[in-house]
Amino acid sequence: MTAVTRAPRWVVAGMAIAAVGGLGGCADTWFGGGEDEAPLPGQRLSVLLLERSLEPDPLLASEPVVLPRPLANEDWPVAGGNPGHALHHLAVGDLLDVAWRRDMGEGETDDNLILSTPVVAGGKVFLLDSETNAIALDLASGAVAWERALIPEFEDEDASLGGGVAYGEGLVFVSTAFGDLIALDAASGGTVWQKNLSAPLRAAPTVANGRVFVITYDNRLFAVDAAGGEILWIHEAIIESAGLLGAAVPAVSGDLVVASFSSGEVVALRVENGRQAWADSLIFQGRMGARTNLSDVDASPVIDRGLVIAISQSGRLVAVDLRSGLRLWDQEIPSTQMPWVAGDYIYIVTVDAEVVCLRRGDGRIRWVTSLPRFEDPEEREGLILWSGPVLAGDRLVVTASDGVAMAISPYTGEILGLQDVPDGVRLPPIVANGTMYLLTTNAELIALK
């Protein structure tokens, strides 16, 4: 019998600030260097609106930011890079140029969005496009290895909002907006098993310890046997009717899985049986406004060396001891993006278009860099949505919905380079085997080496 656990019904209650007028000195290659290489086609964009609301701690002004050395990661098998979502500092080249570009299925429309990044494993890139087609691209040949249309018969293709992919044990696990969790053979694309979970799946699954973990739109976390598709247990969180489009991906470390829900709950559960180890709330009630009235959590939690980092769009960032559930510190910072942990620092892109560097140990702010918020800053129209960051090759990379990729110094917050992309980019980059990949809203995959 499948075990079902339910949430308790309690109420989920050298310092530098980068100041840039216009980035006229941006280099011709991606993020600096080499004047002879041709950039992607398109017009350079200037930073026209810079605002700052968060403030660095002045007592940290003289503290140097020291990061771990870049390490090569062969694959990026799940959303967030690995099951715990902590990758620290990834290795890529000093100069990044476009190695290749490929159309990868159907791009976004007004009705259908791509809400999850691709994954890389076993020499292939896997992704789910805006019409629920699962696609595998062979990295050696550049050819499409296989493609599967996964919209159920008699379903409306305009309902393809969300879902994603993960890789593990030779299988590609696909979550869809139609409530299906599907295991495909990574080599052929053939169906190994399929399970309908009776509610839309907005986010990608994650895979660890022979289990697939995925969250439904109605706030149920399923643990499913990766080999055969048997439902092992279900955790039911508080149902929340109002929320954002996406959803958080669970993080796994050892015998615990940590999940954030649209109710504002963040819970740690036993991988084996789904029993709750602890719970916390990410709802911030200190200010009034439309943003804080939403309890939703789209940012995936991070587990790093026994510490859980979780954040909500309403403005609550917490650091929690993984084993005890004790909250060690918190900050009033709003974000829909997964925090990036590197060594003793945490980097966050806020909903207010700021990149923030905090100390991991106590949450104090080291530096803040403001980004453009509007395409038309004078009229305050055309809201720009920023994604990321990813730390690779001594630079933080963030992307923007208006078609910009930007490199920022992780040490000072200085903007190092700016490059526009032919289409918008609403998802953060991913990195595997020394290559950075960007997926545009038009479902074009750009590889940078």
PLM region descriptions:
Residues 38-58, 63-99, 276:
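Blade/loop signatures of beta-propeller domains
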Residues 138-142, 185-188, 225-229, 271-274, ...:
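Short loop/turn segments that connect beta-strands within beta-propeller blades
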Residues 27-30:
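Bacterial signal peptide processing site
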Residues 129-130, 160, 169, 176, ...:
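Structural signature of WD-repeat beta-propellers
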Residues 100-119, 147-166, 193-208, 231-253, ...:
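Extracytoplasmic beta-rich repeat domains
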Residues 22-25:
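C-terminal motif of bacterial Sec signal peptides marking the signal peptidase cleavage site
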